[in-house]
Amino acid sequence: MTRSRILFICSVLFVCSSAIAQRVPIPQQLTFTPYHSNGIYKIGETVGWTVTPGPDAPTYAYKWTVRRNNAVVLEEGKLDLSSGKDKIEIVGDQPEMIYVAIEPYAALAAAPTAPSASGTSAGQSGSASPNQNSQTPDAASTAAAQSGSTAGNPGGSPQPPQWIGGNTGRNNGLYAVGAAVAPTEIRLSTPRPVDFDAFWDGKLALQATVPLDAVITPVPTDVPGVEMSMFALDALGSKAHGYIARPVAEGKYPALILLQYAGVYALNKHPDAEHAADGWLVLNVDSHDKLPSDPSGGIPANYNAVGNTDREKSYFLDMYLRDSRVLDYLATRQDWDGKTVVLTGGSMGGQQSIVLAGLRPDKVTDVLVCVPAGADTNGDLHGRKAGYPYWPSDNQDAMNAALYFDTVNFASRIKAPVMAGFGFIDTVSPPAGVWTMLNQIPGPKEPVPVIDSEHDNYTYMKMEPCHARTRDILDLLVKGGVYTPKELQP
């Protein structure tokens, strides 16, 4: 992939929405230096950070709260930075994620000053994979908070947000740090349903009786040497939709399947064409039963809550089956090389990638995901903070149904090598769940832990290690190389 193409993708295609304005740089007020630079500790070791204030740090005191798996409070304390530094420490006594929330005791300044031009570079809100263009959960509220407001401004131009600070990407004055204790030993919080495989094998068998009835419609592209189409496929109870991009030249190409972030939106087909120009046969799959060019399609914004108390009615049942249907269609194409199928996506796109690799283990060759959602959905019942899709833990029917759509229960079926990047302070795709999912995969996998990152719609640039690793692996695979996951460094 050319440098210009990489820069274009990074600067344009990862932006969640054109409505999100460039964020104002925010100087770092507090710096947290972990005792272990990779944030990973053994059981019995002291987990800790040295905290130093920056030149613009407020003088008020900070309270810190240590939580196991961001759920169970273990210890609280106060930062005293009067000497120029302080520390936060706790001993990890079991396989777990440590989440530390740091907040000021005193009220934040009533009228915060604007940041100086020497602050950190502005981040972007966007995807963890090469194709995404949508908002992740809560991205809209984040954008509103960080891109300014037109309220009280008749001209309608956004006003700069007030500078409050913090490191979680929310500009709310709060900080968080995270660490992992023996993370490769984190196990399932809830047993896998005994009929899990029978349930999904039955659904796939039923879908196999439905004719594909593929409808392929050419669409324009401005990328030279590439042709594009829109597809619609009959699935079990719904239709799968998306875009296809391929090189114009006749040949057989490796397949790249792009799965989408949470939200309802029109797909951006330009990155599909860019990947096709690199030599991929690309299928970009809409998460919903709607035309990929349609920004809404009548899909409810709270689709993740639809049917969430019944595995037969869950919105994610049809979503996962549509994803599988795309592989059925791929097998009919004469321009596919007949062997390579790479799945990639971020957040809910990562969730779908893991699920599809588990549903169709003999068809998928590689899985590359960042901040994958949908893991450990019952975590709230067992001392682990659960994340998206945010199924209600106070509803036992919802918790029972969730297990059939949880990535941790698909992971044991996966045969392909998996690369997964995730943040240690992510509250949308909590890291304890991602570790749990990875630990269920029997084959090779490559964790890419990013110790200082929230979900990447909040702290996009911090997730660059995963974005960069994805690009490198794709460049290897499109040239016919073989991806071998790197082992976790101690």
Language model regions located:
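Short beta-strand element of the alpha/beta-hydrolase
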Residues: I244-R246, K252-A262
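Hydrolase active-site cap/lid region
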Residues: G350-D397, P449
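Short beta-strand/loop motif that positions the catalytic acidic residue
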Residues: I414, A420-F422
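Cap/lid segment of the alpha/beta-hydrolase catalytic domain
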Residues: A262-S324, D376-Y388
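C-terminal catalytic histidine-bearing segment of alpha/beta-hydrolase fold enzymes
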Residues: S393, W435-P490
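Acidic catalytic loop of the alpha/beta-hydrolase fold
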Residues: F424-S429, D456
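Alpha/beta-hydrolase fold nucleophile elbow
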Residues: D335-G346
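N-terminal cap/lid segment of alpha/beta-hydrolase-fold proteins
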Residues: Y35, G39, E76, A205-E250
